[in-house]
């Protein structure tokens, strides 16, 4: 039994390392999406056409993999599953699509990333309300998850609202290739009216609600439909359908559907294959293995990644407030992850201590047999359950179980 517990712990440790590495890579992938999506919109790519191309490319990447790799895992497709996939697409693809609002508010890519750092708190509340996340307020692990979530959101808020003195650029780009790809960032439409800024903030907060709902809803769907790639494929498919319906009303000019430059092609390919196809697949795997709160709590790391990438690629200034916020985010992330790890550890210990025999009468007979055999000089069976008392009640000594093998010899 001890070897089984150790084996479970080793598997848990190796999987936990994979989950952390996957989530870190995922946040840097999304950070790159903030950069290239800003470039795409400033190059003139339609804010309706862009997500259509993005999700078509993602479907082209994930669809064949799901079809061939999950033939045996994929349950029968029913109307109930189709409705759930449609709702996932409505929240995760259409509802949370930041592209529709980037034209208004994405003057500094760090802002769009930072305002989304309310996602951990919203996801935590949703998951707790739906009982997908256990919160033991009276225990250390529960308090650590609550305090860590607040710290992550607070750190992201500091990065957004407090700049502080500037710090030297991490690296100032001087390559002509970089300038040619991202010269559209220095467009003339970077000054926004206050009403547009406010509208954009409200829209982004609505997207955060949709993003949190998407993360939380995937967990119960995966329990009934365990084929992860297939769920992602159906989500992208319905997302394409929904955006095509939107485009039929708001983007009727065929000229906007054309790709005019290599820069536009690069941004669309990155958004489709990296920020959608690969990212969605990694994210749903992490949700399945780590839970929705585990995935959401990594969201503030995206703010740090965007700030670093914006400083490297765009030459944006890095401020002291960003350092303070990043430290607070890291502390909060550690607290949440420690809380979840402690919760699993306590769960394993509780499961180990609560192991009971399946058939209680058989165990009663087994205990009596142990005593009778011991009285005859035979070594008792040492494979009894851990839940049996070490000192048996003396009343069992008077129990006489008739058995041919135990009859006294004349």
From Swiss-Prot:
Q: What sequence ranges are listed for the domain EamA?
A: 209-338
Q: Where are the transmembrane segments?
A: 17-37, 48-68, 75-95, 110-130, 142-162, 197-217, 230-250, 265-285, 293-313, 318-338
Q: Which GO terms describe its cellular component?
A: cell cortex; cytoplasm; plasma membrane
Q: Does the keyword Phosphoprotein apply?
A: no
Q: What is its main location?
A: membrane
Keywords of the record, alphabetical order, are: Glycoprotein, Membrane, Transmembrane, Transmembrane helix
GO MF terms held by the record: transmembrane transporter activity
Q: Which InterPro entries does UniProt cross-reference here?
A: EamA_dom, WAT1-related
SUPFAM superfamilies assigned to the protein according to its UniProt record, in alphabetical order:
Multidrug resistance efflux transporter EmrE
Regions of this protein lying in the Extracellular compartment: 38-47, 96-109, 163-196, 251-264, 314-317
- What domain of life does the native source organism fall in? Eukaryota
Q: Topology check: give the Cytoplasmic ranges.
A: 1-16, 69-74, 131-141, 218-229, 286-292, 339-410
Location in the cell: Membrane
Q: Which family does the record assign?
A: Belongs to the drug/metabolite transporter (DMT) superfamily. Plant drug/metabolite exporter (P-DME) (TC 2.A.7.4) family.
Identify this protein by name.
Auxin-induced protein 5NG4
Q: Please report the organism this UniProt entry assigns to the protein.
A: Pinus taeda (Loblolly pine)
């Amino acid at each position: 039994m001890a070897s089984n517990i150790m084996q479970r712990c080793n598997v848990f440790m190796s999987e936990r390392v994979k989950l952390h590495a996957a989530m870190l890579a995922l946040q840097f992938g999304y950070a790159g999406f903030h950069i290239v999506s800003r470039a795409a919109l400033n190059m003139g790519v339609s804010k309706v056409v862009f997500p259509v191309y993005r999700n078509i490319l993602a479907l082209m990447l994930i669809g064949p993999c799901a079809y061939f790799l999950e033939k045996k895992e994929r349950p029968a497709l029913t109307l109930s599953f189709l409705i759930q996939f449609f709702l996932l697409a409505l929240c995760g693809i259409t509802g949370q699509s930041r592209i529709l609002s980037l034209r208004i508010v994405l003057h500094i890519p760090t802002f769009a990333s930072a305002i989304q750092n309310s996602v951990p708190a919203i996801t935590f509340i949703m998951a707790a309300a739906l009982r997908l996340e256990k919160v033991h307020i009276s225990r250390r692990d529960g308090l650590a998850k609550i305090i860590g979530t607040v710290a992550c959101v607070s750190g992201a808020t500091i990065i957004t609202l407090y700049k502080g003195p500037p710090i030297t650029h991490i690296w100032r780009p001087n390559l002509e290739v970089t300038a040619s790809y991202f010269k559209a960032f220095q467009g003339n439409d970077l000054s926004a009216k206050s009403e547009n800024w406010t509208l954009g903030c409200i829209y982004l907060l609505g997207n955060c609600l949709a993003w949190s709902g998407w993360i939380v809803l995937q967990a119960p769907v995966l329990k009934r439909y365990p084929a992860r790639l297939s769920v992602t494929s159906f989500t992208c498919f319905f997302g394409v359908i929904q955006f095509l319906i939107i485009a039929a009303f708001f983007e009727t000019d065929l000229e906007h559907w054309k790709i005019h430059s290599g820069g536009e092609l690069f941004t669309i390919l990155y958004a489709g294959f990296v920020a959608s196809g690969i990212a969605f697949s990694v994210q749903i795997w992490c949700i399945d293995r780590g839970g929705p709160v585990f995935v959401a709590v990594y969201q503030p790391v995206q703010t740090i990644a965007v700030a670093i990438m914006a400083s490297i690629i765009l030459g944006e200034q890095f401020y002291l407030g960003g350092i303070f916020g990043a430290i607070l985010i890291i502390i909060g992330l550690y607290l949440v992850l420690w809380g979840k790890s402690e919760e699993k550890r306590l769960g394993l210990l509780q499961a180990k201590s609560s192991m009971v025999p399946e058939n209680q009468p058989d165990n009663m007979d087994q205990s009596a047999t142990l005593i009778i055999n011991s009285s005859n000089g035979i070594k008792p069976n040492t494979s009894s359950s851990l839940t049996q008392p070490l000192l048996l009640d003396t009343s069992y000594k008077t129990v006489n179980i008739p058995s041919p093998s135990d009859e006294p010899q004349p």
